[in-house]
Amino acid sequence: MVFAWLGPEGGEPPALPALDCFVAPASHSFAFKGMWQCNWLQAFEVGIDPVHTSFLHRFEHDEDGAETRKAYGRQFRAPSVGDVDGERWPMTRVMREVCSPEIRHETVMPGVTRLTTLRLINERLTHVRITHALFPCTFVIPLSPTMTITQMHLPIDDTHTYWVSFFTSFAGPVDKDTMRAQRAATMTMPDYIPKKGQHNDWGFDAEDQRTRTFLGLGE
């Protein structure tokens, strides 16, 4: 990722924002990019929308222990953090059963908004999700309890957008080979064109919709 100063020649460029992905050691961060067939603003908006996950990423069944252990690098697979009396919901269940959360927003500083999403599970347990929107084109969202995604959206034209994601681990070093393989499998190289799109109904599968996911679009 290359950042350019486009201000007056000889001017002093501002420092990069103090985002986790820019201060983490190289061993704990990983970057990848792709292309979406949509406007950059659509890509930015859906990333900060905490409710779309209950539909676009909704699985009708929870994974068992063996499958959960394979959750590395995949969204909404790891168990949520915290439990009460031994009850700890997997993220698939949180997203599936609590689809109308309370959403709060506040301005942290000019151009930066914090969104807090509260999903009431029971009288003693509430799932809290924190995301940040850095206008005009960046958001920071959780991937798992120990990893975040900082994603930027770069317009190509009105209907095509590059996304660049920085994954930051707050636990051990990032397994970059696994992360790269997971994402490379969804697109063609070296042009980064997604394998699923309007040309093939985004991979819609009626059987998948009947038995596994809300929209029938797989992972």
Language-model regions: role of each:
Residues 3-219:
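C-terminal catalytic domain of Rieske-type non-heme iron oxygenases
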